[in-house]
Amino acid sequence: DPKDRKKIQFSXPAPPSQLDPRQLEMIRRRRPTPAMLFRLXEHSSPEEEASPHQRAAGEGHHLKSKRPNPCAYTPPSLKAVQRIAESHLQSISNLGENQASEEEDELGELRELGYPREEEEEEEEDDEEEEEEEDSQ
């Protein structure tokens, strides 16, 4: 009795009565069991996938499921993410260097033309502060 209690009872729909008992047995044999599905989910070698026994046993359906689903999102690998991050950081540092050199070029040109650009900016800031103080009174 203790052994009988450990057996798992699966509820299955009653088969149509018009089928022959031999056909029912063949259908039952073709149906994958949970253990079979678990085994198929594991990565199997290509030799196993091509074996004729597997197709004869009705397990060939899993080969279709091995194809990637075009709608499913596959996240990038860790190496791909690292490459993306490195290229992003590189582009940021390149932008920073280019902007700094462009600003230096502009300042040099302005100084050559006699414009003390930095002093003008400070004066503009002072004017804005004075206007804000007048507005608040």
UniProtKB/Swiss-Prot annotation:
Quote the cellular component terms of the Gene Ontology held in the record: cytoplasm
For the biological process aspect of GO, one term held by this record is: intracellular signal transduction
What residues bear Phosphoserine in this entry? 44-45, 101, 136
Keyword flag 4Fe-4S: no
Bias (Polar residues):
88-99
Q: Where in the cell is it found?
A: Cytoplasm
What coarse category fits the chief subcellular location reported for this protein? cytoplasm
Q: Where is the composition biased (Basic and acidic residues)?
A: 40-62, 108-117
Positions of post-translational Phosphothreonine modification: 33, 74
Q: Is RNA-binding found in the keyword set?
A: no
Which molecular function GO terms apply here? protein phosphatase inhibitor activity
Question: What InterPro entries does the database record attribute to this sequence?
Answer: PPP1R1A/B/C (IPR008466)
Query: What are the protein's UniProt keywords?
Result: Cytoplasm, Phosphoprotein, Protein phosphatase inhibitor
Give the residue ranges for region: Disordered. 1-137
Modifications made to the protein after synthesis: Phosphorylation of Thr-33 is required for activity.
Acidic residues bias: start-end ranges? 118-137
Q: What role does this protein play?
A: Inhibitor of protein-phosphatase 1.
Which family does the record assign?
Answer: Belongs to the protein phosphatase inhibitor 1 family.
Full protein name: Protein phosphatase 1 regulatory subunit 1B
Taxonomic source organism: Sus scrofa (Pig)
Q: Name the lineage.
A: Eukaryota, Metazoa, Chordata, Craniata, Vertebrata
